[in-house]
Structures are given as structure tokens and as C-alpha cells.
């Protein structure tokens, strides 16, 4: 009795443990934010961590980001929140469709914790390189701009690169003359060169001229300074960009002149309620910058200043074109490509796939232990109780061919899964009451016992096709009561026992009803014995 009590106590503890574990199983996203290019797809399962096999996804804005079979699809520019839920927990992720989210940092942000920044979904960073310029005569003029590289430049660039965060450079300007603008350009180029080629070659965003220093210059004079700087940067092999707020872009610069020269613009317009579903234009104009500084109070931990401040930005992705691929009138798939760029779609090639046979007689009655047949019609003279045939179709679905009631087996080889096979190969089923094929996966959907053909057709050229004959048997070989794929003495023994104990066949034992009268009886046992004698 004591032993029984101990066992019961152990069972109770184990059950309680698993109940407790299940009650506190959680599902969450591995990042809080994710950027998607418009018309791209994202497998949501790939960014989920879960202790629970059962969870669902919902989207706050299906017009922007829709969800089909756990795949997020970016439909247009905007922001959407996707929620994952299981019976115990929920979590959310912010999807930015058509734009990246980033920060801009300098020495004032201290030692930025770049791994922590990356973990919070930051895609890019604008890093201050320097301010002013170096001139040995500045001291005499009362200016103190010597050696003004940002002291955290090297550290910040390395941190961004090490954490796969794209980055660019910005330089704070004090220039009041063309000559000073030239010196500032030379100064920022020297700061960039100090990084070394290993870092420079990984800089993917522009070199920015930060224009916000108070000035009494005219629009033309200040614009001349900006153009001078940008020209020097271009000549050095970098792409220039101009940072300014509304006052500077509208009242202190010739905006139309800058846009006509196709310079990238970075617009400072912080707001407490940013709208991410429309691109931000410079106030009072229809000019859309490529980058928008939307906040000075970012909440990205590990990058804030000592006062808790952090500049937040969005970088608009290039305009996208949707390319749709059709088979006649049916949309097969779609792709996104940057406007003005080309899209290469690799057409599939039908490739050979084999059938592996074990233990059959060839047409000269020679016993063959094992072989593989490729891309040809094949007829095998087989002893049905010995042959084992497994066919491999696209997506590695396995079908067991039932050979019990035929001596000769003929079939064509189904093509091997190739590039884009789901999008470019159609399946034709002769008798869909027996089986169907999922058009997008190539998986067989069996419906009832029977034999039919599946023809695989290359959509781009309907003359390229291959056919497989498929036998579907949802249960087991008739008479194979012990389910070892052979009808043998053990099956006969089982059949006799069933006959002695039961006159009516149980539903799950009907594969032993060899004469199809709905009852397992002496006749079935006799037939099983005959099959066994033939094949032992």
C-alpha cells in the first residue's frame, strides 16, 4: 500500500508539473519591430519563439499588411501591428511597410549599446563624424574648431557594422563662406578616411550636411555653401544629403534648386503623434524627403543621452513595382522590385526523379534486390507479396503503391521538384474522387481507395509533362491483419481467432474481409491461408 501511495504521489507531482508548465507556456516575437519592402512576404513563424505549438496571428491593418497562412504580405506603404496569441499569452510586433526605422547618434549619446539597439528593431543609424573644420589660422580668428572629429565615431561605426545596422554619416556645419564649406567637406572626408576601407566599404547611407547653424546669409548664399559641400562629397565618391528643419528648407535655402539637383533630403520635423501611414512632406510643399526625423525623445534603451533624449528617424524605401505572374487567367505569384530595376525569374526545368524498387523479378525472371529507374516507362514482373515500391513526388510526399492485385506495374516518372515548382507546375488528376493534388505544394490529398493518374505539366510549355499512375489505399493490404505489408501465417491465425470470437467485422478490421461480405469469417481465413501458401 505504501508503494502504491508513493507511485500515486509521483504521478500527481508529474501531472501538476506539466499542468503548471502548460499554464505558463508563452509565445512571443523575437523582435518588437520589423521592416518589410512593399510586396514582400514574411514567414511569421520564423520570428516567433513559442512553448506552445498552437498560436494564431492577427493584423491591425490588413490593407497595409495582410496575413495568409501565417505569412505576412506587405501590400502598401504604412504601419501595421501584428499580434500573436496562444491560450496563455499575446505579443505584438510593429511592421513598417515601405520604410526603415533608425536613430541618429553622436558623442552626446555616450557608449551606445548596439546589440541592445538592434534587438529593439532598429534598422539604420546616422552617425556624427565631425563638426566645423580644421584650419591652422582659425585660432588667430578666434574660432575653436580644430580637431573636431566626434570622439565616438569609430566606436559607433563598428557597433553598427557588428550588429548589421546600415549606417551613414553626418557633419554639423558652421560654414559662412564657400571656402569654409570646402574645408568642411575636406574635414568630413578626412574623418571618413580615418575609419579605414573595412568600415568605409560598409557605409550604405549618405554623407549628410547638417545645416542648422544660425546665419544671416541670404537664401542664395547659404544654398551656394550647401551645393559646394555636396559637390565636394560627390567628387570624393560619396552620396550627399542635406539635413534641415522647416525654417531652413523654406526660409533660408533655395529648396527648388536643391531638388532640381536631385540631392537627398533629411527633414527634421519632430511630432508627438507621428503618422507612419503617409510619407511626410516638407511643410507647405509637396517635396518628400528620403529621411524624416520624427522625434527627439526616442525610447530606444541603450542609446539615449544622459537626459533621456534620442533622435528617431524613418528612411523611406525606394518606390516598388508589383510584378504578377499568371498561368493563363490564374495569378500564380507576385514579386516586388524597385522601380527602374529589373527582376530575374528563373524558369524551372523538369528534372528526373527515381523510383526505388526492392525485391522484384525483372522481365527475364531474374531476382533484383534493388534498383532505381529514371524518366522512363517501366513494367515490372513482380511477386506482389515481395515488391516494395515508393515514389517520390514534389515536396517529398511519399506514396506507397499497392501491388497486391496486379502482376504487372506500369507507370511514368513524375518530375523532380525544381526551382519555383509550386508556381510553375500544374497538376491534372484524372479522377478527383480518388485523390487531388494541392496546386501550391504538390501534396497528394487522398480521398478514397482507387487508382488514377496525376499529370504534371510545365506551365510555360504545356508540351512538357509527365504522368504517374497512383494507387490509393487508405487502409492496409487486404488480409494483412498484422500490418506488416505481407499476407502471412500470422494473418491467417488472427483471422481464425476473429472468426471464432466475432461474427461481425469491426470497422477498423475490414481490411481482413477478403471476400467483401462485410464479415470476417471462415471464408476469409481460408482465402488468407491460400494467399499465404502462394507467397511463403
Q: Over which residues does each language-model region extend?
A:
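Catalytic domains of cell-wall/extracellular-matrix polysaccharide-remodeling enzymes
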Residues: 199-280
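Functionally critical loop-and-helix segments that line ligand-binding/catalytic clefts
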Residues: 98-109, 259-320
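Extracellular/periplasmic catalytic domains that process cell-envelope and extracellular macromolecules
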Residues: 96-97, 118-121, 161-163, 198-203, ...
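Sec-dependent N-terminal signal peptides of Gram-positive bacterial secreted proteins and lipoproteins
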Residues: 4-24
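Cellulosome-associated attachment modules in secreted, modular CAZymes
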Residues: 18-23, 467-536
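Extracytoplasmic soluble-region selector
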Residues: 24-98, 385-480, 489, 532
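Substrate-binding cleft of extracellular glycoside hydrolase catalytic domains
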Residues: 99-230, 234-236
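Secondary-structure capping and domain/repeat boundary segments
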Residues: 27, 34, 320-386, 403, ...
